[in-house]
Amino acid sequence: MDKQQLAKMIDHTILKPEADKASIEKLCKEALEYNFASVCINPTNVELAAKLLKGSEVKVCTVIGFPLGANTMEVKAFETKDAIAKGADEVDMVINIGRLKDKDYEYVEKDIKAVVDAADKKALTKVIIETCLLTEEEKVKACELAKKAGADFVKTSTGFSTGGATPEDIKLMRETVGPDMGVKASGGVRSIEDAEAVIKNGATRIGASASIAICEGKVSDSTY
């Protein structure tokens, strides 16, 4: 895989709360230079990013119910509609992890579907299951519920919890959702070796703040 192909699999990410206007402008400039799949930013920065990326192939991705997933489904649905109205092309939502652990699967599916329905095919929906907090059984169940609810992708992590993507989790997620659904690895992908390992195991998208280092074959210690 060459640098250009790899770049098209990466969501160039900055989700730090202290990200200012200059940070977003730099992120978008880099995304245009490398032709990354998208920039992934907090909702407050969607309008600016949409303006900076207008007319390019680079998509605007934002986060919903982030990073805890503990908002109500009504709030997540509103966030989704608002983000799309402001220019988002993709939304990465966090599941209700506590309800999953309660085995309240009906709620978890409805919560995901609320975002899928709010997106109304105007934006891709990615479902963050926060793998580091789940058992193997819970990871499988979360992926099954995301697929059943009609989401486009399952995603490993927020990057704000106790761990990120692992090749093993990506393999399990890919085996669970089958060949057609997207699988996004995020959190802890900081080198070309990390990227190749998750791609080999079934990732079709990578969320990273170390995107440039990955494409240039370097190692970064950067975090979201």
Curated annotation (Swiss-Prot):
GO terms for biological process: 2-deoxyribose 1-phosphate catabolic process; carbohydrate catabolic process; deoxyribonucleotide catabolic process. The keyword Glycosyltransferase does not apply. It is an enzyme of class 4 (lyase). GO terms for cellular component: cytoplasm. It comes from Clostridium perfringens (strain ATCC 13124 / DSM 756 / JCM 1290 / NCIMB 6125 / NCTC 8237 / Type A). Pathway: Carbohydrate degradation; 2-deoxy-D-ribose 1-phosphate degradation; D-glyceraldehyde 3-phosphate and acetaldehyde from 2-deoxy-alpha-D-ribose 1-phosphate: step 2/2. PANTHER family: DEOXYRIBOSE-PHOSPHATE ALDOLASE (PTHR10889:SF1). Its main location: cytoplasm. Belongs to the DeoC/FbaB aldolase family. DeoC type 1 subfamily. Pfam families: DeoC. Keywords: Cytoplasm, Lyase, Schiff base. It is found in: Cytoplasm. InterPro entries: Aldolase_TIM (IPR013785), DeoC (IPR011343), DeoC/FbaB/LacD_aldolase (IPR002915), DeoC_typeI (IPR028581). It catalyses: 2-deoxy-D-ribose 5-phosphate = D-glyceraldehyde 3-phosphate + acetaldehyde. This is Deoxyribose-phosphate aldolase. The keyword Magnesium does not apply. Catalyzes a reversible aldol reaction between acetaldehyde and D-glyceraldehyde 3-phosphate to generate 2-deoxy-D-ribose 5-phosphate.
